Amino acid sequence: MKDMKTIEGIIVVTTPEIPGYKVVEVKGVARGGTVRATHIGRDIMALLRNLKGGEVKEYTEMMAEAREEALRRMALHAKELGANAVVNFRFATSNLGGSMAEIYAYGTAVVVERVEK
């Protein structure tokens, strides 16, 4: 797996298979999530940007950080399950009120082995 990009030592792909590898064991669902809330500073900047129009960079950055954290937590959970990869990885989001959002990362934790050519 040294030639494959990993997160916390876990291969993570959105596809059901990993080229060059075969699934030898399914460990279950790996998951990781985080809830992020806005704060007054971000809200004020967002309001000002909203008046002008365009991207609200403060929220974009906050959500990017949240996705990375959810992804990292999912990889750590996969490792706890004894997996070395996650296939069929996805993100889900939900609004938890006016100023909070949950980012949830999930996929199938598996053990893969390199296929000999």
UniProtKB/Swiss-Prot annotation:
It comes from the Archaea. Pfam families: YbjQ_1. Belongs to the UPF0145 family. PANTHER family: UPF0145 PROTEIN SCO3412 (PTHR34068:SF2), UPF0145 PROTEIN YBJQ (PTHR34068). This is UPF0145 protein PH1682. It comes from Pyrococcus horikoshii (strain ATCC 700860 / DSM 12428 / JCM 9974 / NBRC 100139 / OT-3). The lineage of its organism: Archaea, Methanobacteriati, Methanobacteriota, Thermococci, Thermococcales.
